[in-house]
Amino acid sequence: MRVYQTNEIKNIALVGSAGSGKTTLAESMLFEAGVIKRRGSVEAKNTVSDYFPVEQEYGYSVFPTVFHVEWNNKKLNIIDCPGSDDFIGGAITALNVTDEAVILINGQYGPEVGTQNNFRYTEKLKKPVIFLVNQLDSDKCDFDNLIANMQEIYGSKCVPVQYPLETGPSFNSLIDVLLMKKYSWKPEGGEPIIEDIPADQMDKAMELHKALVEAAAENDEGLMEKFFEEETLSEDELREGIRKGLVTRSIFPVFCVCAGKSMGVRRLMEFLGNVVPFVDEMPKLHNTRGEEVAPDSKGAESLYFFKTGMEPHIGEVSYFKVMSGCVKTGDDLTNSDRGSKERVGQLYACAGANRIPVDILNAGDLGCMVKLKDVKTGNTLNGKGIDQRFDFIKYPNSKYSRAIEAKSSQETEKLMAALLKMRQEDPTWVVEQSKELKQTIVHGQGEFHLRTLKWRLENNEKLQVTFKEPKIPYRETITKQAKAEYRHKKQSGGAGQFGEVHLIVEPYAEGMPAPTTYKFNGQEFKMNIKGCEERTLPWGGKLVFINSVVGGAIDARFMPAILKGVMDCMERGPLTGSYARDVRVIVYDGKMHPVDSNELSFTLAARHAFSDAFKAAGPKILEPIYDLEVYVPGDYMGDVMSDLQGRRAMIMGMDSEAGYQKLQAKIPLKELANYSISLSSLTGGRASFTTKFASYELVPNDLQQKLIAEHEAEVKDEEE
């Protein structure tokens, strides 16, 4: 394989909903380029892309697969991405390191929720988009309707380059309005027959050709002037206008294929090779200092590692993009994230499960290495004299969580190691060892996401695991003022223990004025503040601790011990054992003994006094509330809203976005436990959602009583 220069390289992501045919398209592209002699299929479990056992088990792509084809003296690096929303991390990774997105649309269904999700990410990243309508041989495909729907969603930027003469099982020909030719195939596919457009199609073809020319001309002043003068453009001018329109996202060309028979795939590849922008024609990326980094092969050497694969008999395979410079076997590089040194071994061009040895990779290219010493997903390796990092891939918050346990305690350590290893392969996993909940929790993107994790743990790692709903991280607080006092006294021969603490508690809010006077049962307590400590608590909220003791009733040296006693109770609230928050504590009096008082005595006295005061101060349980955005087809809006209301959600607003309804709500975390499953069931898998932590709010009284009763029962069981 020859060395490709930066201006000969194009990086392309294949994205779209599950079942839109991305892996099948990848097979056809490899076949057309002569990389493989026979097309595999998902059903036969022999595709280049879906080579991991878990993918073959479920019949879905789980990981993004990187491969390349050499086409007309150009190198096309292509990433075949998972379509399921549960594996959206793979698509996000690919869209960040490639320069163009081909968004596949299943001709039977038109734009689906996966189409919308991927388009939104391309919008955020400002990536060029080509729409590709697949499955034109389906009975349910109505191309004219589909294009009308797409233009309603994406506007006039969505411009057909091709249209089929007919759809359904008899599909075998299309009209290309860029080249103004008819392409047709034998029923089994094969080489296209290229002919002039039939007379009965000329009017429609000319109308679409004119729309394409006009859309292309809008991207260049000179082309626009020529279009106004001559009402046409040459083929080269048309290509140039489309290329500029792709870069500025002012045009979204629509192509047609039947990927299963390779019909239209060769023509698509010609367009990718001839028209879509090269790496060095795209906007520059930025390092973490905000500096632009150009894909210049003569620049400083810098590699960004965007993916790690774990392969049997090989170990870690590390995939990277050459951000600048050129990388060669034997180069010495420094990991700017970890401070370690790496020597480059054999370099490879990516080919799915296979790798093609190469000696050099230039700026903008994608490649991989095996068995690196200390490189993780997201790391940057730099050459001598440069220290920069890249951190441009942002993954969505998790949407589905489960507590995970190994079936035997002896395997717990092995389980943690396996989970951390799998997170290298899929950074959307979040593994949390919760000290608060005493659980190991895995956070993912959906039920299917966790199901594949379980399969891999059991089949690849030989670990038996169980899942269950995680506990909810409730909080406790108070709603009114209260006071309490407690004397801790212990005498059993020798030195005794003595400490007495009088304190007041009240709800705390940011910016509250310092206390001056309190009244309880007609008695007035004036405060004389000697010291104040405000703590931002690790679990959220604040504790304000005030020393208002006068007359030497308690030595100042015992105040840290009293604060420790208060913090002990804040870490285990009296209602449910949950963390407490947003409390102000004023220690205003107490007693000590000249011999028997010590730090332990005051810690114990403070615990009891605080607990008694907390219970008398209108204690309440708080639950985590999340912001929820649901993207749903209008037909399902009523069912989705009804379901949310049954989950104690508060609807905050509704809006239309790209053909879907966007519903915004606030919902308790407890009600999100199985929401991904319910939403999929309600909408036939045609909706998606995102979540983000918002705040803690009071639980309803009936739920509070239930939670307290459950906690008391747990404590009783532990004591027995």
Language-model features and meaning:
Residues 1-105, 109-111, 160, 204:
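P-loop NTPase switch module centered on the Walker A-proximal segment
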Residues 1-20, 107-312, 333, 367:
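P-loop NTPase catalytic nucleotide-binding module
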Residues 4-7, 45, 236-253, 357-365, ...:
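Short, hydrophobic/aliphatic alpha-helical segments
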Residues 6-9, 23, 45-46, 59-63, ...:
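Amphipathic alpha-helical transducer elements in NTP-driven molecular machines
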Residues 46, 72-76, 96-102, 216-226, ...:
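Gly-rich Lys/Arg/Thr-decorated short loops/hinges at beta-loop-alpha junctions or inter-strand turns
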Residues 73-75, 99-103, 126-132, 248-253, ...:
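Short, surface-exposed connector motifs at secondary-structure boundaries
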Residues 78-80, 255-256, 442-443:
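Short hydrophobic beta-strand that contains or immediately precedes a catalytic carboxylate
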Residues 149, 158-160, 164, 168, ...:
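Accessory interaction regions appended to the cores of large information-processing enzymes
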